[in-house]
Amino acid sequence: MIIVCDTRQQAGKHDLKERYFAEQGIATVRSKLIVGDYTRLDNQTVAIDTKKDVLELAGNICGGQHERFRNECTLAQKCGIRLVVLVEEEPPHGDVGLWQAPKTKQGKLLSQVKGGVLKKAMATMTERYGVEFEFTTREQSPARIVELLEEIGR
């Protein structure tokens, strides 16, 4: 299997994944993807869009990035691509509805989005566009990417 990594991924922020892929003998190439951050070179029917944490997800779904994110979900749906959003942070007790935005050192919330609102918005995105959401740890993320891409064609 050869994994395609989107060229718009920030350099140096994904070394853990790249190292894991190399250790597993999985080749990678960089190319601009129409949706997501990772897919297979030989079968692009699944794309994985990674988010570093729930705060980034909240910004994409309920914040200033909503239109761009929605457009990406719509494009995936139109192209018959299964889009999996892999969030590299596990919410409290496995329930994003319990999530609370982190605070700055001054005690100000980094986002006004509440966990319950985010959970409902995620359900709406799944219902309308078929996008799937999964939560994992940063350390387990590379293995989960490989698992999801290996499922293609089974």
Show where each model-derived region lies.
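Conserved catalytic cores of phosphodiester-cleaving nucleases, focusing on short active-site segments
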Residues: 46-52
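Non-catalytic C-terminal interaction segments of nucleic acid-processing enzymes
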Residues: 1-43, 56-154
